[in-house]
Amino acid sequence: KADVFIFLDNVKVEKSSWQMRNRLKTITNKEDGEVWFRIPTKNIHSDTKINEVIIDNSVNWKHKHKTIFENNYGEKFPDIKFLNKIYDKDWNKLVDFNIEFIEKCCEFLKIKTELKKASSLNAEGKKSNLLLNLCLELSATHYLSTIGAKNYLEKDKNLFKSNDIKIIYHEYKHPIYKQKGKKFISNLSILDLLFNENMNAVNIFNSK
């Protein structure tokens, strides 16, 4: 839906956020479950920005991730070739890993949306003011927001209205796809979709 997607990489990071960890499905003889896989980071303070977070490479996190992939998705892990290439590279900053991962997922899913980093733009401010200034810098007419930001955006909606920018809240409808196990678990990492459906993931993703 969006013409441009902006990575808010120059705002404060939240500990244990989705930037650092995600979930995949596990299957045992007894039940279906979930496993967290995370990227360890060095000291994060209250004022640390997302683009300042350093990966703690003293922990062999890439090996741990690959073990999770192989144990739960078996032979399907090598099929996602871009993932192997990402994990074969050396990474220092968390933001660089995350952005390349998202870029490669977009290529795989044939998503043509232009991607930009907020830190590469001139816009300043906090919360609604920052979002508004980013929209203005890019001459946007609409701002597509997650439903989670509605509480504070609604308080400042007149800021956007006075600048002829319409706020649209994206209510995500989770697709059902082929998944191992007895029950379907939603809202996992996009890797679950890619491992289970491979190239068919393009059709599933773009049908929503």
Task: Locate the predicted segments by residue.
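Residues lining hydrophobic/aromatic ligand-binding pockets adjacent to catalytic sites
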Residues: K1-K208
